[in-house]
Amino acid sequence: MIRLPTLRRPPGRWGRALGAVVLVTACDRGPARETDAPHPVASSAVTFNEDIAPILFAECAGCHRPISASATPARRIDGSNDVICIAGAPFQLLTYADAREHAVRIAAVTKSRAMPPWLPESAHGEFVNERRLTDRQITLIQQWIDQGTPEGDGPPPRPPVWPEGWQLGTPDLVLTLSESYTLRSDERDVFRNFVVPVPLPSSGAIFDTRYVRAIEFRADNPRVLHHASVAVDPTRVGRVLDRRDPGPGFATMPEGDVQNVYGWSPGKAPVLDPPDTAWALEAGSDLIVQLHMVSRGSSEAVRPTLGLFLSTTPPTSVPLTIKLESKSIDIPAGESNYVVRDSYVLPADVDVVSVYPHAHYLATTMRGTARLPDGTTRTLLSIHRWDVRWQDQYRYKTPVFLPKGTTVSMEFAYDNSYGNRNNPRRPPLPVRWGPKSTDEMGAVWLEVIARHREDSDVLTRDFFSRELLADTEAAELRARSDSANAAAHNALALKYMAGGRFDDAEKELNRALGLQPMDAEAHSNLGTLLQARGRLTDGVMHLELAARLKPNDDRIRVNLGNGRHAVGDQVAAISEYRRAVKMNPDNADAHFNLAVLLGPQGHVDEAIAHLRRALEINPRNAEAHRNLSIGLGLQGQVSEAIAHARAALSLDPQSVSARQQLDQLLGQQRPAAPNADLIGRRRNH
């Protein structure tokens, strides 16, 4: 994803499902574990009732059980009555008969540690809720098989009772996908994204923010749901993508300001985070739920539900995310040991709370390390047998302290040969970096908390600069290796623009147009760039052409409106903004730009309406608050005008105009005149 201005939370904050308060379910490790030190074989008989049932019930039955009759059942379109287990487990393990029938298979997968699914190596890091059998447990299972799988005396043990309903109590907010997605029987694996509007209860405050302590994910069809992630979309760009896609949801997670905040996988217990580490959810934001679904041979409907547990108390410790990643992945067909690396030097002392590695089907091994300033090295994570089906975020039992100057590094290896049984392409083909499951990725997200509160900004600024440089280098590589691809040059130009390299950006956009003269995106970007460089007429020419080529794109209409205004044609500018608002009512920039032109023309009521709409979508637009304050002041709504002036100043403490507006409203000067400046900085797409 392209994420420019801020240090971000981890994808899925995947580990936000793990926290200081641990609710133990059958798929969790439980409160206490034995070490993996060798254990002698028991001299007495090993029986199911006494020895094996406790292991299976604690470590396996959480997934190897039917969906509860009182839970929302999986909806089988084919009408079959087969037992459907949680997470698509192939059989249940709740009785002696179950265990005896599958005893040989159980012995094999536990001995190889393929089950329970847990990827990190035991010697590197202790994590919350580890799903790992001890050596003694594995030995007991093997001995039970050798002894002929005896049941034992006495009554059969009772299986665990799993919580019904919401495990964390009644949520403050319950959200369900607006429509079901039907997974066809012939679909191998599907990633699909769904917009979920968040109707936060209003507190009456200017910044109507809630703080999320937990998300509890209820899979209505865990048989086919492999995993899910939840992201916050503050700009509502997901709604645009959803409207453009004819089916339920849309295919690719959007780029930009979308921030992943939660991840779910089968068997993961929901956990209520402490109030001081909750994450902010602004009014007006949407959630985007990404579902990874795997067909089980029949058409099935999927429509999960989310429960949000909210707080009104701002957190005292806000986790940030350091992302190590290689976007230069280009694996030749047949290559069995392709390696990528990345590293970052910490500019401040941090505590590492969790680590989340991510790759697709070709990855084999992963390693994350920290080299401290004194020269010592600590392994943060080591995975020797990667399996994308069981990806997760791993939360340390005790946060790992890393001092300023520590170099954190990642190293991933990939196998794109016939020998990799997980390779989805037969015969193997070259594979590059990309978001699709048939592409490859290589990233590690470290969730960290700055030891000193003031260092959070230091981390954010430093990491943004570093990531922009890395993204630019990746875009340069793609443009060189795929020089006939206009989109690659356009993407590189955007990176150059973000870094202030305007000459280079203009060259790349001209290259893109040389390859694709009718590329609307490139014309729009070039027009915006030329306008910013003072070449107004040339800029408008490119923007007009972009609008003709792509007449229903609200982003291009906003840029053309800005171009019209820059050359003094306010009537045409207003017309373009109105078109953009009609095309996409959730385009905050269109509402804002329209308002700042309508106000000085005396259309204060309409300007106020558009400013309110812009702030409903993006409540942290300081210029929108300032302009709304002016409009409300002109209408005599002084109290609300003061509130918005203060909001503008809190968002932009250096704003002289916001300070002057507040002073005027507080009576130190006369109220602003109608032409005082109901025009803020226009916003481009």
Language-model segments: which ranges?
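Aromatic- and Gly/Pro-enriched helix-to-coil junctions and flexible linker segments
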Residues: C27-P201, F207-R210, R218, G284-Q290, ...
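Conserved alpha-helical positions within TPR/SEL1-like repeat arrays
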Residues: A487-M497, E521-A532, R555-A566, D589-G599, ...
